[in-house]
Regions:
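Selective detector of the "anchor" transmembrane alpha-helix that sits immediately C-terminal
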Residues: 186-213
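Short leucine-rich amphipathic alpha-helices used at interfaces
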Residues: 163, 169, 212-213, 219-220
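Soluble catalytic domains of enzymes that build or remodel membrane lipids, polysaccharides, and related
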Residues: 1-191
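Cytoplasmic C-terminal tails of single-pass
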Residues: 217-229
């Protein structure tokens, strides 16, 4: 393995290894996995130019900082179903989760460590993201959080079941698979991109108009000054 930025050196030798945040799908005759792509900034991924923080974070045990992520979403198979498993922070990215469905996922799963939020609104808001992902992609979702809330969502984003925060529990639910790919899954956050483009055009137009008006006013002021003389 090459000594690239995410690689970690093994002992004092010339061997290197990667660390991943991964989802496993274990069946009776198969083991599949995917590695988290959307790494959490500062905790799982830091810019290469800030590489000096890598050693600090590893020493202090505060952050990983050098995880290796997959380049794109990967769908896993279980029986007749294709599974899209979003890992923690990835569930906040609608377009990314939609890419699972565009690749054939008929069910979505979210696995997350929400313990570091503590008893704050953070874990509640993270739970709500799964509702949006269900609606955007018309997929049922099973969500598993180590400290809660875990739950099941139907294709309309309705909560079918949910656990309480920080209480041990086990829940079971039948979910309906869907193979139809929504417009959102195909095209992503097109509305936000259009909004950015329109905002950029309006901003440039406003700047250009302001400069033209400034030039006109300056010429008018000079003309008035000359007439007075």
């Amino acid at each position: 393995m090459e000594d690239d930025f995410p690689a970690r050196k093994l002992g004092n030798g010339e061997r290197y290894y990667y660390c991943h945040n991964s989802a496993l799908l274990i069946s009776s005759n198969d083991l599949q996995h995917r590695n988290k792509s959307q790494l959490t900034p500062a905790v799982e991924a830091i810019p290469e130019w800030m590489g000096f923080l890598r050693n600090f974070s590893l020493t202090m045990g505060i952050a990983r900082g050098t995880l290796k992520g997959d380049p794109e979403a990967k769908v896993m198979t279980f029986g007749n179903h294709n599974i899209g498993a979003a890992i923690c922070y990835e569930s906040a990215f609608g377009e990314y989760v939609g890419s699972f469905c565009a690749k054939g996922a008929d069910l979505l799963f979210v696995i997350t460590n929400d313990g570091w939020w503590g008893d704050t609104p953070g874990y509640k808001q993270h739970f709500e993201f799964s509702k949006l992902r269900a609606i955007e992609n018309r997929r049922c979702i099973a969500r598993s959080a180590n400290t809660g809330r875990s739950g099941f969502f139907n294709q309309r984003g309705d909560v079918l079941q949910q656990t309480k925060y920080w209480e041990p529990d086990a829940i079971k639910q039948t979910l309906k698979a869907n193979t139809k790919v929504t417009f959102y899954a195909k095209n992503g956050d097109y509305l936000s991109r259009i909004a950015v483009y329109v905002t950029f055009v309006l901003l440039i137009t406003w700047i250009a108009k302001s400069l033209l008006d400034f030039g006109k006013n300056r010429k008018a002021a000079k003309s008035t000054s000359r007439k007075k003389k």
